Amino acid sequence: MLYLRKYAPELWDEKCELDAVSISDLKTNDNDISVWQVANDESNIGDIALAIALTRDRIQDFYAVVLKDEDIFTKELQMNPLPGETKYENLRNEHNNIKVPTFWEIGYLAEYMHKQMSNDDNVKYFTERFLKEQLYQAVKNNKISQEDIRDKK
């Protein structure tokens, strides 16, 4: 299993060392950090990207980093599965959380993400155009209704 985590490149990229600014991008909710499940072959990555985009008021391009479950578990980080808050209802259960109860876990996760970002294969950029095409296809294929996304343009 792979996970996708949205991130702000201006806080991470071009840095040789991890710093507090990068870690500030790892906002928590009840000591959890949000991630989305992606198939190992990344066959559902477009739908997952759309689910992430539909957590916001409008569709915007974004960067995400691919995380591997075996690496997460090697760091002894625990998962806390909770439905995602997205208008893409069919994918709400593809959401998960990484538990980070202390600064140690946040630090481990930040180091791992930073390492993953150093390999371009692990960094994904989803353009607004791509996301809108994904949305069009999802509506066309009855994966999501127009009523569910009426506020999303």
Predicted features along the sequence, with ranges:
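ADP-ribose/NAD+-binding catalytic cleft of ART/PARP-like enzymes
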Residues: 1-33, 47
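Conserved NAD+-utilizing ADP-ribose enzyme module
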Residues: 25-31, 39-153
